[in-house]
Structures are given as C-alpha cells and as structure tokens.
C-alpha cells in the first residue's frame, strides 16, 4: 500500500469550497489501481472495459453505474472505446440539507452496494443533469458552487429513481431491447442463453439486435456473455473454496476442460494459477 496511487483533491477541484465537479473520460484509457481523497459516481455511456473494484472484476458497458468511496481501490484495463464520466464529490463539503445517505450507497457509512445499472430512460435523464452540472462546476460566478450542489442533489435522486440491480430490470415496456438483453445475459451466468428465444419473446430481429448491441458496447453478444462469466469465475476462484469444476458449472460451462481453455485465453493463466496468484496477494 506504500506505493498506492492516490488521486488528490487539489488536482480536480478549483478551490477548497467546491464540493462537486465532473471529470470526462472520452475515452477512458487504461488506468492503474488507485484510491482517492474524494468519492465518485461512475457512469458508463459506451464501449467496454474491465473495471476491477476492490479486487473484484466487472466487465462494464453502457448503462453501468458505480458508487465509489474514497478508500476503494479500482482500476481500468482491457478498454475498448470506453466512454464514461466521473462525478466526483467531497462529502464533507456538501452543505445542502439532503439525506445523502439515503441517496448514495456507501455515503459516510451507509450500506454499500457499488454496482447498479441504468436503462436508456435513466441514462438520458442523468446525462441532461450531468451536462448542466459540468457547466456549473466550470463556472466562476458567485453561485456556481451552490448551483452545482443543487444539480448534484438532483442527479443522485434521478439515479436512485432509475437504477436497478444488474440482474433485475423492473417490469416495464419503457426500457429498450438492449436494456432487457443485458439484464437477460446477467441472469444467464449458470445456464445457456438462447438469443433466438429472446428475440421471439420480444418480437424483434436477431440481426438488428446483434448490430445494435455491437454498436453500443463494442462487443458481440457472445463475447460479452463469455467475459461476464469469466469475471464471475475470477471472483469465485479468489473468494470461494469451490473446486474448478464446480465454478465451471456456476459460470455456465458444462465442460470444465473447455472452461479452462476459455479462462486461460481470456486471462493469460489457468484457473488454478489465477487462484494461487490471488491467494498470494491477499
């Protein structure tokens, strides 16, 4: 930890009164593991990448939302046209009489669940507020900080209204096919996913859906599902006593030998090597 990279307030905030600002990542490059002197919300707009948060890997793409605390360690690797925005804030500088703990998971000791998703409607509403927030956070007039904090309050309420667990899209017809598809894929970690059956259920064109998915995420549907499963396998290898064959089954691979081949191709090491290396670093 002595050599841990720490992002400092003075490099992101204009003065000691500013509570909120926006850091664009157009695109997000590979970024080494780091912590912060501040907290942040991470909103992914497009592309894909590997986000490792407190040693847990997440394959991220459009609609992914993270609540990051100052002490959290995270990094970005294997990025592909990854476009995101960081809304960074200092909890101790917030002055509005808002129940921030109810709005922001992990805020000053509140229960923390870091990873959520936003559907297209929530993304559109959040983007509008973030654009206004970015404008105010770059402003120099006397009320800029107050306006930015008001907009931050609006943003966290908008996110709370529209966010949902990664595998639990609310039953509504207002979300897009891509939102429904990504949720269906998240629910297919342990079982085969049949795209033709999904398209039949949603009465949509399989070819068009494949094109839309690749345009928004930079991956094919099969690539995304495979990498989500491998991320889950990495987590289980590090944090569970399950045998490799059991993990293979829990990650949708009926053949453990095939699982090992895919895992090695994606990570550069066998499942056993990954587990050994992870245990050494703990």
UniProtKB/Swiss-Prot annotation:
Keywords noted in UniProt: Activator, Cytoplasm, DNA-binding, Repeat, Rhamnose metabolism, Transcription, Transcription regulation
PROSITE patterns: HTH_ARAC_FAMILY_1, HTH_ARAC_FAMILY_2
Gene3D superfamilies per the UniProt record, alphabetical: Homeodomain-like, Jelly Rolls
SMART domains: HTH_ARAC
Residue span(s) of domain HTH araC/xylS-type: 179-277
GO CC term (a single one): cytoplasm
Compartment list: Cytoplasm
GO biological process, one term: rhamnose metabolic process
DNA-binding feature ranges: 196-217, 244-267
Keyword Glycoprotein: no
One Pfam assignment: AraC_binding
Lineage top rank: taxon: Bacteria
Gene Ontology MF terms: DNA-binding transcription factor activity; sequence-specific DNA binding
Chief place where the protein resides: cytoplasm
Site description Interaction with sigma-70, residues in chain: 246
Subunit-level organization: Binds DNA as a dimer.
HAMAP family linked to this entry: HTH_type_RhaR (MF_01533)
Described function: Activates expression of the rhaSR operon in response to L-rhamnose.
Protein's UniProt name: HTH-type transcriptional activator RhaR
Gene: rhaR
